[in-house]
Amino acid sequence: MKGSDRIEKIKKYVRDTMVCPGHNIEHVLRVYNLCLTLSKGEKIDHEVLEAATLLHDIGGAREMADSTGKTDHAIESAKIAKPLLEEFGFSEDKISHIQDCIISHRYKTDNKPKTLEAKLLFDADKLDALGAIGVARLFAWIGKSNAHIYKKVDDIDLYLEDNFSKKINGRIKDKTKHSPQIEYEIKLKHIIKRLNTDKAKKIAKKRLKFFKDFLGELEKEVKGKL
């Protein structure tokens, strides 16, 4: 089976099986397209990058279904990927590389990306939380979770201690206490420091400015300022 045929089969599998709202097919395809952009001109195994990107969140439903907070969707995605990749004729070396990329894409763990393919996946995945799409995703979550459109807290550390689980997935305990402003302070503005590639950092700088400017305009409108 040719590489392009294998990638198309993976795309079909992902389209048919992605059921987790937090890690849906739209997110996967955005990350996939961004990986293609970031990888232009790079000497990498493009089939490894494409396969890993398409499968990186396939285990999201398992994490969401685990109320204990001990399940890591990156680990689960790597487990699910292995037999599928074997079925499609990937070599053991490629399967191992793809699994490593998937496992290391998670922001909240110490599994750091080592290869360029893994770094590109990590960067593209994080960029999807920023910019216009980041605003859209966050406010979709805000509406679904009945959280605040606008809310700031005086002590971020105290908020984290009070409202964040220390389990592997770092879940928010009470989503109704959360807000875009809090999410920006505790995570989004720090993403750029974690990125690996210069291309991604350049994109992140632009997207962070958009996000920050949006929050500034939102605050003025909430407070009735002209």
What are these regions (language model features)?
Residues 13-18, 63-64:
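A short, mixed-charge helix-start or loop-turn motif at secondary-structure junctions
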Residues 7-11, 32, 75-82, 99, ...:
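An amphipathic alpha-helix signature
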